[in-house]
Amino acid sequence: MLHKNDIIETEISDISHEGMGIAKVDGFVFFVENALPGEIIKMRVLKLRKRIGYGKVEEYLTTSPHRNEGLDYTYLRTGIADLGHLTYEQQLLFKQKQVADNLYKIAHISDVLVEPTLGMTIPLAYRNKAQVPVRRVDGQLETGFFRKNSHTLVSIEDYLIQEKEIDALINFTRDLLRKFDVKPYDEEQQSGLIRNLVVRRGHYTGQLMLVLVTTRPKIFRIDQMIEKLVSAFPSVVSIMQNINDRNSNVIFGKEFRTLYGSDTIEDQMLGNTYAISAQSFYQVNTEMAEKLYQKAIDFSDLNSEDIVIDAYSGIGTIGLSVAKQVKHVYGVEVVEKAVSDAKENATRNGITNSTYVADSAENAMAKWLKEGIKPTVIMVDPPRKGLTESFVYSAAQTKADKITYISCNSATMARDIKLFEELGYHLVKIQPVDLFPMTHHVECVALLVKA
C-alpha cells in the first residue's frame, strides 16, 4: 500500500504530452517532473488520487542519454521551458509523435505520414512578447515567473526563450521601479501599484512596446521614468498603461492609456507590414510563424481564381499573406478590434481584394453562402479549443476544394479532422512546426481535400 512521502525506486516508462515523466507503480500511474523515459529514479510520493499519483525525483540512479544536462531547472519549475530537460532533437521527435498519436487515437488515422517537425537552428531567445508579474520577494520588488501551480514569484533575469532586448528592457524597468520606489502588487492584501510588465518587439523592425499594468491610474514621476527608459532604449516607440483593479488572474483590464509615442509597433510577416497593439494576437515566434504560414500557403496550392475564406483571421496575417495570389479573401474574426486592425493592415499593404467582418466564423460562413460566395479554399487557425461542430458543418456545406487547418492543439485538430472526414473530406498532408521550442506546445498545418 502506497502512502504520501514514501520513497520508491522506479523506472520512467514514458513521457506525457505535457513533458512529465510517467512511472507505473502498484497499479498507480505517476507523473513526475524532470524525469525522462529510461531513467531509473528514487521517487517521493507527493500525492495519490484514485489510480493517479504525482511524484518527485529524490535521486537519479541512471539518467537518459537524451537529457539536456545544461538546463537551469528554474525554467522547469516555472514552466518557462517545461520540455527543456530534453535535447532539442528529441523535442522535435516528441512533437511529431504527439501529433501522430492524437491522429491515431482520436481520428483513427494511421495511413497519413506525419512529417518530421520543422525546428529552429537556435531554439532559444525567440519570443517577441513577454508578460511578467511584478511582486515583492524578500522585501524587494522583483520580476520573474510564478512557480508552477502557485503564485510564488521566482526572480529571473534571463528568461531563456525571450528575445534578449526584451529581457534587458524588463530588467531595466524593474531597476527603475525600485529606484522610484513604486510599490509592487500584493495579491493577498490587494495593495500596491504595478502588477505586470508586458513587452512586445518587432522581430524585423526592432521596435519595442512596454505596457505597465497598474491597479490605478496615477503613477508618480512617470515622466522622469519615461525619459530614462527611452534614453536607454531608443527602440522603444510605445509606452502604454493598462489599468486593472480587479482581483483576477487576467493580465489586462479594459482601459489603456498611451503614455509615450504610438499605441502600436510595426513588424513584417511574409513581406507584409502589420501594426501590433498591446492586445493584438500575433504569433510570438516570427521566424517559425513565417515557416508555418508558408507551409499552409504551399499546401493550399493557390491560384488567381481562388476565393479564400480566412476563418479566425485575427489581424489578417494569414489572409493578407495570400491575398495577392488569389481572387478574393473573406476574413472573419469575433474580436472587433482585430477586424478593424485587419482592415487597416490591408490598406497599409495596398491590398484591395479582402473583406473582413466581425462575427462568429460559423455565422459569417452561413451568411456568405446565402450571398452566393463559394470559397475554393478555407483556411482556419482556431484557438486551442478547436473548431465548433457548427463551423465544420458550415465549412463542409460550402463544398470548398480544400480545407487548410493551422492548429495549436493537435488533439482538438484530430477531433475536427475526424468530423471533416465523415463529411466528405480526406486528410492528405500534415506538418508539425515548432513555434515554441523548449515547451511541450506544437503547431501544425494539415491539408484536407474534398473526396
From Swiss-Prot:
Q: Does the keyword Repeat apply?
A: no
Q: Where is the active site?
A: 408 (nucleophile)
Q: What class of enzyme is it?
A: transferase
Which InterPro entries does the UniProt record give? MeTrfase_TrmA_AS, MeTrfase_TrmA_CS, NA-bd_OB-fold, SAM-dependent_MTases_sf, TRAM_dom, U5_MeTrfase_fam
Q: Which parts of the sequence bind S-adenosyl-L-methionine?
A: 283, 312, 333, 381
Write out the GO MF terms: rRNA (uridine-C5-)-methyltransferase activity
Signal peptide, first to last residue: none
Domain named TRAM is located at 1-59
Pfam families, per database record: TRAM (PF01938), tRNA_U5-meth_tr (PF05958)
Keyword annotations of the record: Methyltransferase, S-adenosyl-L-methionine, Transferase
Q: Name one GO biological process term.
A: rRNA base methylation
Instruction: Please state the Enzyme Commission number of this protein.
Output: 2.1.1.-
Q: Which NCBIfam families match?
A: rumA (TIGR00479)
| UniProt record similarity statement | Belongs to the class I-like SAM-binding methyltransferase superfamily. RNA M5U methyltransferase family.
Q: Which PANTHER family match?
A: RNA M5U METHYLTRANSFERASE, TRNA (URACIL(54)-C(5))-METHYLTRANSFERASE
How is this protein named in the record?
A: Uncharacterized RNA methyltransferase SAG0633
